[in-house]
UniProtKB/Swiss-Prot annotation:
Record bears the keyword tRNA-binding: yes
Record's subunit section: Part of the 50S ribosomal subunit.
Chain's gene name: rplA
CDD domains in alphabetical order: Ribosomal_L1
Annotated organism of origin: Borrelia hermsii (strain HS1 / DAH)
GO-annotated biological processes: regulation of translation; translation
Record's protein name: Large ribosomal subunit protein uL1
Cited function: Binds directly to 23S rRNA. The L1 stalk is quite mobile in the ribosome, and is involved in E site tRNA release.
Family: Belongs to the universal ribosomal protein uL1 family.
Length: 224
């Protein structure tokens, strides 16, 4: 721990805490001060100026994928169920699958449902809600377009959501990735985030933006 602490402090010493860096310089700096051997995730932390009634939640497909493919579970019947299977969902079913999840099955990362299934799927609220997996129209996981939705999820469609304090954390890459690809992911995420600015919000939407690696210190981004 002492050795890691020393390396962390050495990394911090290379960051000008009074300076806001361009995204290009920030990514380069994160790689320069990296002190662990494993492939760290590059994360963005954003402080938003939100009122209590504001919700910022959506999804984005990043141009450069870096996460392992997620296991998709779909609640659907009949032709829709067949469509989901053909689209590549890992698990597809209706009442049988609902009962399986009730019984403790949890080997999945994303849940999608057709609108007609939501009355029964809603009963799984205590289970799915706890994991943040309850289907929701805002994240396009309640849909009849299963083919399109599953295709998007397989391409890496990822949800972003601000918490009650207006803080939004999102991963944009891995330290092993080319700097340009990390920046492209960052730019795409920011573009989609800005579309979610509440219509009645006055003043600044984004208060501050920081970028960091899994084990490293954060670097402030010059966000205009």
């Amino acid at each position: 721990m002492a050795k890691s602490g020393k390396k962390y402090m050495q990394a911090i010493s290379k960051i000008d805490k009074l300076k806001s860096y361009s995204i290009d310089d920030a990514i380069s700096l994160l790689k320069e001060i990296k002190f662990v051997k494993f492939d760290e995730t590059i994360d963005v932390s954003i402080n938003l100026n939100l009122k209590k009634n504001h919700t910022v939640r959506d999804t984005v497909v990043l141009p450069n994928q870096f996460m392992k493919e997620k296991r998709i579970l779909v609640f659907a019947k009949g032709d829709r169920a067949q469509e989901a299977k053909e689209a590549g969902a890992a698990y597809v079913g209706d009442d049988d699958l609902i009962n399986k999840v009730k019984g403790g099955f949890s080997d999945f990362d994303i849940v999608v449902a057709t609108p007609d299934m939501m009355k029964d799927v809603g009963k799984l609220g205590p289970i799915l809600g706890k994991r943040g997996l309850m289907p929701n129209p805002k994240t396009q996981t309640i849909t009849n377009d299963l083919k399109g939705t599953i295709a998007g999820l397989k391409k890496g469609r990822t949800e972003f959501r601000a918490n009650k304090n207006g803080v939004l954390n999102f991963s944009v890459g891995k330290s092993s990735m080319d700097n340009k690809k990390i920046k492209e992911n960052y730019d795409e995420f920011i573009k989609e985030l800005l579309k979610r600015r509440p219509s009645d919000l006055k003043g600044t939407f984004v208060d501050s933006v920081y970028i960091s690696s899994t084990m490293g210190p954060s670097v402030k981004i010059d966000f205009v």
